[in-house]
């Protein structure tokens, strides 16, 4: 057990200091989990200082560790061994969600470690998963508008250094979030996606699956020299979201404006918040009426196809949670509500349960990952069909990013509305849920509506 009390200090700066500090030294602050949208889901932003230990899984499944000793097994076995709670739950006077632990990235292809029968094509990325042990971080509490420096192990020198860097960053003007110029923008051929939708519908008609989420790619090249922090700031301004993030690790970056939560663990309470059902939003900064918003959301929640897809996926999430929860504890406590973001409306539900005493946070990840809303039902067969139809690795897209606290709590998003960047090259994916009565052209337009929010971060050169 860790016995030295954490150090937590309020710093006289505003929340923009976290983004300024991240932009100044992305290698020193590799992970920024950012509540970039207003609302009840957006309470805390976390900026992680350089890790004291790490576990990395490469694109072929090989493991590398720094300052920890690998145990037999795969990435999740090692994460489970090293991320076990070392502090009692709720053991901080400020009631912060996270005061130290592991920041974790899971690429979509990690699913093959959970379900060995899956043969997924590797993604074009240097790593497929990593976990970073962090003992120092900055926290922005949006409810009170306080910025806090946190040093879990109570190291006074590390704490004073973090406070000084935040104060210095607070003197600077926040980074420029203006759109970035593009030299090139390529979109996957629309006809190919239409054919994939028809093929998925054939699988549904044959009884292989009930629903599948198919995605397509956009590839961009920047005209100017813009690092990941600048790209993230432009994305954040164009498409704010409650589970946004910027990660830079070993020369590769992922930049997310995700609206979706995979799981939240607080004590023994666990929840997942599936999104299924989307409409392009006609009310934007450029114009539109609130009356149009109301009409669009009403049509969305009443549409038979959207309702059927959503109900099917609620059942999938209930079953997944039931694998790690106490019998009879899994409930749907929010049912088919609408959430509106800058460019789309979504149907959202919340499913919660009571985590069994013998189940860890990593056990919960094994049960839920990847999220059913971005695979389909039944999950494993859908993933086999997705791999066959898409023909390429997804990487960060529909993976997950979040944290495992040293008190056992956890919070993970689903990496939708997410860019990956290596130098000037950027890639993004967007998908749509396919069911028996899907209209291929309408599903194509849904992928474009989802991509549009991200593409607003860029302008033609």
Task: Locate predicted features.
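Extended alpha-helical targeting/anchoring segments
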Residues: 1-461
